[in-house]
Amino acid sequence: MQDELFKTRYSKYGYGIDVRRTYKDLPCQPFWTWVTGKSLNDRPPRRPKDTLLKPWQLYLHISWGYAVFFLAVIYGQQLLASQQPLWLKCLLGALIMCLVVNRQRGFLHTFHYTTHGASLENKALARFTCKWILSIPILHTPRDEYVKLHVNEHHSVRTFNTEHDVDLVFMKQHGFYKGMSESAFWTRLVLAPFHPARILEHLKFRFDVSFVSAPRHERVSRALYWAALLGLVYASGYLEAFALFYLFPIFILTQYSSWIQHVSEHLWFARNEHGLPRFLHYGSLSWGRFLGRPYPADKQGLAFALAFVRWSLGVLLIDIPLRVFSFMQDLPSHDFHHRKPGVNFWRIAPERAANEARPSKFGPMTETWGMWENFLILRDHLCRGQSDPFGIVDWYRENHARLAPETDAANQPRTNQPASQATA
């Protein structure tokens, strides 16, 4: 049941409203759910296990990713050999690369959810899918190592956003820290992933986890797969297109695609300086990152026409490109993944909506609309010492007496608890 106390909270840089509600009368609501990343689902929440996919559903989802990879190389070869003007070749080539990046990172996030047990009920099939179907084609971290680094450390309430969290270490390696100058923040925000050292580190990491540090059976299977693939590509005469439209996107472009969303994924380097209950602090480090701006339904005549053009251009030139290139699949609702890691990515937007304003040990949900708001929140936190963008600290202080019966039991530390169980 919804509780006014747990209604969604917004930052000072946002619109102060649920922007998605302004889209509710537009046609084709599933499309707007995809564009914005936010659902208007008003049904009761489902149990996480009720959101899992059937094997055929997961493999249908994966198969269209393989189709994109295959067609990108085939059509890319034809494009390179065509007599089209250079500008058109560049435009079409960029679109192909964008789609390959989308599916490469789609594979990564499908692997991510499958590792969490949030794709298939059959765990043996899930492990097989992670190893042979999802990770080898993109040279992703082997499953067992990923469980250690991501599930046991990044998701643990004890190590999340600490020096033991590999995702925080990644931000530190890219030059971010609490107390940095604003000029350094903006410079690194834009340029960090293009630094040659960072690119080489990324390539070395992908090679090491696949062919050096991985278990022997992983190294052998990956070496055989890639030897066969490269041999087939070379023999068929598609090597140039394969390098440009497959290898370049998955090894280079994906870095910037990932970077755009990763920098605002959490409130990096934040510490529990105000003594919040542990799960409330954990929940305060993530927020819904949706794409859009209010639909101008309140305007009329010429004012509406001008506002509608501006709104439409924002959808076409900002929201859809960001959704395709960087915020694919579940990423707008990544905050809810940390609250309910067992919910499948196909259902995460509707389930997040179903859980909004419901009492939770993680506190009220929070959200932003647009990348610029995310960047300003991160700047304020890292450069200006303003580390409570949604007012969660004041919210807790004002409502502590009422919250205590609901949250204290869940927020008490548990002794002798394995890290793998200390997750959200």
Which ranges hold each PLM region?
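Cytosolic/stromal cytosol-facing helical appendages immediately following the last transmembrane segment
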Residues: M1-L53, K123-A214, F242, L253-A424
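Core segments of transmembrane alpha-helices
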Residues: H61-V73, R219-Y234
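Active-site recognition of the HExxH zinc-binding catalytic motif
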Residues: L108-G117, H154-H155
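Transmembrane helix interruption/hinge and helix-loop junction motifs
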Residues: A81-W87, A235-A243
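Long, contiguous internal "core" modules enriched in hydrophobic/ aromatic residues
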Residues: F207-V220, A228, A235, A241
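Auxiliary, metal-adjacent structural segments of Zn-dependent hydrolase domains
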Residues: Y15-N102
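Membrane-embedded alpha-helical segments that form the functional core of polytopic membrane enzymes
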Residues: F69-F107, L134-P142, F251-I252, L317-Q329
